[in-house]
Amino acid sequence: MGVTGNVYKFLLVLHIACVILGFGATAFNGLYLDRARRKGGREGATLLEANGDASRVAEFFVYAVFVLGILLVATSKSAWKFSQGWLSAALALYFIDLGVLHGFVRRLQKRYDQVAAQLTEMTGPLSSSDDRPSQVGVLEQLEQRLQLGWGIFNVLFLIILYLMVFKPGA
C-alpha cells in the first residue's frame, strides 16, 4: 500500500470529497441564518428548515472525514504517524470543532428554531416598536451567538485544513 498505492489514493479521494461535502455544506450556515431573518415569516422558517435538513446530512460527511483520515494514516505505511505534531494538532482541533458544533451551535440552533416557531405563529400587524414581541429580541441575541459559533467552526476548519496541507514539522 503506502501513499502511492491505489487503496490510499482511493481513500484520499473519499476523504477530500467528504471534507468538501461536509464542511462545505456547513460553511454558509451563518449566511442562511441571516437571510432567513431578513425574509422573516414562513419564508424565513422554510429557508431555515431546508438548511437544517442539509446540515444534518452534511454532518455525516464531517464524521466520515475522521474515519477516512484514520484509514489514510493506517494505509500510509508509516508515512503519517499519530505522533507527528501536525496530525495530532489537526485531530485535536477536529474534536474541538465537533464540540463547538454540538455543544454550542446545535444547542443554540434548537432554541432559535423554537423561538422562531413561536414568533411565526403570532398573527396581526405590529403598530409600533413597543408592540415588538419579546421573541424578536431573543432571536436577535441567539442569531448573534449562532453567527459567532459558525464563525469559530469555520476558522477551526481552516486551521485544520492548513495543518493537513502544509504539515508543519513533518
Each language-model region and where it sits:
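Polytopic transmembrane helical bundles with strong interfacial aromatic enrichment
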Residues: 1-170
